[in-house]
Amino acid sequence: MTPNALMELAKDAMLRAYAPYSGYKVGAALLDESGQIYRGCNVENASYGATICAERTAFMYWAQTGAAMRGRKPVAIAIVGGKDGVITDFAPPCGICRQVMMEFCDPDTFRIILTNGKEVRSYTLAEILPLGFGPSHLDE
């Protein structure tokens, strides 16, 4: 799947975002090594701490399908966002989402694909989370 095709799926997911408080809508499309796509959107809550990001929604969807238990590694995620769903800038993942990615992904190969509506950029997880803490740090 091309980065642009994955980005289009993220844009579609953004249409489902529930953001009545901030108005900032985000969509994500997660690709695993089998070619399966898992979409997510942000879902806000009046108790702000209960809000969940689009990226984590996509990862939780991936996990609940059993893909994690079957060892199907995520290989890329496209993320798009903007106020009222209008894309004007890049929407990089927050720190919590980066940490979730670190749990399940190879930081050197997993790609984060972003757009500002004019250009598409791609980064590895290691580039956006240098010195990331992951499961390998807990190995005995």
Residue locations for each model-derived region?
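Iron-sulfur (Fe-S) cluster-binding modules
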Residues: 140
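Short, basic/aromatic recognition patches
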Residues: 2-19
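Short beta-strand scaffold segments in enzyme catalytic cores
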Residues: 25-31
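Short beta-strand-to-turn element immediately C-terminal to the catalytic PLP-Schiff-base lysine
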Residues: 31-32, 115
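Zn2+-dependent cytidine deaminase-like catalytic core
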Residues: 39-137
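Active-site segments that bind and position negatively charged phosphate/pyrophosphate groups
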Residues: 22
